[in-house]
Amino acid sequence: MHTPGMTAGLLAVLLAGVLHAAEPLRVEVSRDAWISAYPTEQEGNNGGASKLKLKGNQEFFLIDFDATKFRGKRVVRASLHVKLEAAIPLGRTTVSTIAQEWVEGKGSSYAKEPGATSFRWARNGDQRWNGDGKDITAMTLGLGGSIWGFGDPTPPDANRWQVIPIDPAVVQARLDGRSYGFFVMDDVGSEYQRDGDKFTYTLFPNRYVASKDSNRKSSPYFTLWLEDGPAAPAPQVKADAYQAPKAPVTLPAVPKLPSAETSVTATDALGLPIPGLRLFAAKGEAVTMLLSSPPAKVTIDLPHRRYDLPKVGAHVDPLKASPNGRLLEFQIPKDAKPGEHRGMLRLDGQDVPFFVHVWNFTLPDQLSFIAQMNGYGLHDTSRDWFRLAHEHRLTLNILPYGWTGRVSAAPKLRPDGSFDWKQWDDRFGPMLDGSAFADLPRGPVPTEALYLPLNENWPMNHEQHFKGGYWIEDAYDPAYWQTFRTAADGFAKHFAERGWKETMFEFYLNNKVYFKDGQNGKPGNWKACSAPWIFDEPMHTQDFWAIRRFGLEFWQAVAPYKDVRIAYRMDISRPEWQRDLLDGVSNVDVVAGVLRDYPARVIGRNRRDGKLTYMYGGPSKLGQPLVINVAWCAETWALGADGVVPWQTIGDKDSLTKPDELAVLYPGPDGPLPSLRLKAFRAGQQLAEYLTIYSQASGQDRDAVGAAVLALPGLRAGTIKTYDDDAGSSAFGDGAARSVAELRLRLGAWLDAQAPAPRARWHDPRPTRQDPSHLRPIVALPAPTTR
């Protein structure tokens, strides 16, 4: 319920106080329909079913009454009465307005009834939902001019009836003609039972209630408390922040390349053939040439290095530096002479010419697009790993805690609760002031992002403070939040004192309550994970609500340190269900491949709030085309996002002998090793820089350039997932490889002709800090009184 400055207790008192001024009025249901977001049921209609179903973010119902006779009345209280038709009762429940007309239908068993309402259609086959047209979430839960509230129903009575409280503003909108009924959703979703440390998880329990098509005695109904007189001013509704589609620009033509014949075959970082052994590169860029056999000698007036490609099973991927390697890498100096540089390869006793054409523009040292190599559980946090990523224009970020919240890289906690920073500063300080990277191609640019060790179980002891329940406002004692705020303040204050103002310091909650659940027939264990909610990839309203509370506490704690780049990061795989709960709360949103389904919604909302947006997923698999990683970067830039995050990129001790689909950085005997896939991500980041420089130098709108990129053959990808929470991998269409290769040539040749002056940074993707003190408080309605 959006009620500024109001607590749940005060709200209950005020609601009770209006009863003397308005008598309860029973209002019958005029129409209802149960719909489903489950993938195979999204066009199904159950408007004629005898039951209505609630099931987390999978199944919901629409319900309505005839509001015409109540026009001009003021709503002071409202509730919905439902009779349970299943053993599991309702928990906290949302009631939202619906901002578009809908059709009840007569379907059952998820019938695809033409003209009836479903999750995907306002009228099946005839009318999509408005907004971005994706589904009903575009017209409910705060979008499309809708408003919502949630609250706790009464416990079931002796006859299995429950009463759901409704925000009076939600009903008022119906009376005033600003709504077409009510969307009802289960906010609890999955449940668990705990007996000591024994843990049992129940995924998406079914919650059934009788519909109006059951019988008169079981039919749901509303109770309204109405008064004469003008209604209170309608709540201010935040305008939808959809990113409007732009007409694609005309990209520069593909340049005509010099014809050259050679019997030597070679491929570039995209895994594509290099015609005439002629490479093209900007100043400050790195390019590669992979030969079928190692040359005896390489000569050229540009810095270069060589790598061997040891096999892992049937695949090649990890790279070992070698003076006799067959992968050649050329790092173009920023002061390199523009134009053609001729080199010579000694192959089979013959001298074979090759060429590196240096374009007359320079890649910036500070990144416009961040390809973040994510990692977990790496105990060796030596600087070599971070240097390897930095050298490749990539950002390594390693989460410093595991499922139980135990930290592996945090300042020592003194008995008085303060931190001893000595060892932590020695380890990470050079990466935060940039000195660790001073001798690398980008120079002393600090690492772009660093996870903080803060989590639900550090430095707080979760079990000492957790009181249970699904709703975070009642789950912890005040001491828990005080300890958390003190710690967050301590980090921000220390960073401010050290002058570390470039790196994004990310507070991120990664754990999930269902990690406690048993696997492979083993019983669940409460101690297996410290999270009582799904923090990473939140699923249910209870999860988003908990994440919101942590964010409010975090921003309150770090508010005094304005110059430190503080971030509240979260991984989002269900942006359609986050409502406005994260608006003004998170500022780094790492969004799954579902970004491809909701780009206008996600990008528009995040740009409005100054957020950084990544797309996360998996890297290309061993044996797949390297161009996938490059195309992923180009596509993500074109969608309007600021970077990509392959969710796991660090191999283990066996990755050099057993194929590892996720290893992009390999542990070697003498330190970390790069890979072909790592260099493909670098090529993708560099292409994103081309796109950024082109849009700025040409004066073209970024989104119009993005539309042109997405219109190229094969560059609108799909996401392949093997299970619901799979990060997924990108599947590009036919022609993607050629489109990416030609895109690079189009932009490079155009920029070469324009010769824009170098800049340290062409675009700053880093987010603005959030200030939730300006947000309207959201308060859950208490359970209705018995009257």
List where the protein language model places each region.
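Proprotein-processing/basic-patch segments
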Residues: 165-236
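Catalytic-core region of carbohydrate-active enzymes that cleave or remodel glycosidic bonds
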Residues: 586-656
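Surface-exposed binding patches on compact interaction domains or structured appendages
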Residues: 241-275, 286, 294-328
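Beta-strand-rich interaction/scaffold domains
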Residues: 87-172
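Aromatic-lined carbohydrate-binding surfaces of glycoside hydrolases
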Residues: 306-308, 330-334, 342-561, 569-583, ...
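Catalytic domains of carbohydrate-active enzymes that cleave complex glycans
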Residues: 454-465, 472, 476-480, 484-581, ...
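A short beta-strand-loop element at or near the start of a globular domain
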Residues: 35-91
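Short, surface-exposed loop/turn segments at beta-strand-coil junctions that are enriched for proline
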Residues: 68-72, 169-173, 331-338
